[in-house]
Amino acid sequence: MNFNINQSSISDAITKTFGNLTINWPFFVFSFLTLILVVTIVTLLVYKPLKKMLKNRQNFIQNNIDESIKAKEAALKVQEEIDEKIIESSKHANQIIEQAKLERERIINNGIEVSNKKAEIIIEQANILVTKSQAEFENKQRKIIVENAVEIAKKIIGREIRDKDNLKMIEEMLES
């Protein structure tokens, strides 16, 4: 019940407030023209520059997106080129390493060959030296034996052997 009282008092208040409202046509036309004028001014001074600014901003953003896509594509292309150069460099490095190994083996083989030749020469020289030393040793031994034989013959014969023919004969006997 109290609810009905409040509701009717609210209705009465609304009717009082809006009941006296009537349309004032000159004021309505003036307000309408003012609204059109304000909308036109806002459109010309705010909306169109704002729209133009947003369009420019959109173009700027789109250009940046396009440029970043182009830059990304260029970066990918450069990355591919760099990867290809790295692969090529690796292959080239492997070829250089293989060539170095072959050169090393060639140098080692040449060194071994030269060393073997030098060793053969040294051995040959040593053999010649040994043969020469042995011949000198044999000659010295023969000389000592001849001298000893002459001394023994002197003692046996009891006289000195001065005759060159006798000395030659003794030497020939010892040599054979």
From Swiss-Prot:
Keywords in alphabetical order: ATP synthesis, Cell membrane, CF(0), Hydrogen ion transport, Ion transport, Membrane, Transmembrane, Transmembrane helix, Transport
InterPro entries in the cross-refs: ATP_synth_b/b'su_bac/chlpt (IPR002146), ATP_synthase_B_chain (IPR050059)
CDD domains xrefs: ATP-synt_Fo_b
Keyword Coiled coil part of the UniProt annotation: no
A single Gene Ontology CC term: plasma membrane
Claim: Membrane is one of the keywords in the record: yes
MF annotations from Gene Ontology: proton-transporting ATP synthase activity, rotational mechanism; proton-transporting ATPase activity, rotational mechanism
Pfam families the record matches: ATP-synt_B
Subunit structure: F-type ATPases have 2 components, F(1) - the catalytic core - and F(0) - the membrane proton channel. F(1) has five subunits: alpha(3), beta(3), gamma(1), delta(1), epsilon(1). F(0) has three main subunits: a(1), b(2) and c(10-14). The alpha and beta chains form an alternating ring which encloses part of the gamma chain. F(1) is attached to F(0) by a central stalk formed by the gamma and epsilon chains, while a peripheral stalk is formed by the delta and b chains.
HAMAP family with a match to the protein in the record: ATP_synth_b_bprime (MF_01398)
Function statement: F(1)F(0) ATP synthase produces ATP from ADP in the presence of a proton or sodium gradient. F-type ATPases consist of two structural domains, F(1) containing the extramembraneous catalytic core and F(0) containing the membrane proton channel, linked together by a central stalk and a peripheral stalk. During catalysis, ATP synthesis in the catalytic domain of F(1) is coupled via a rotary mechanism of the central stalk subunits to proton translocation. Component of the F(0) channel, it forms part of the peripheral stalk, linking F(1) to F(0).
Protein name: ATP synthase subunit b
Classification lineage: Bacteria, Bacillati, Mycoplasmatota, Mycoplasmoidales, Metamycoplasmataceae
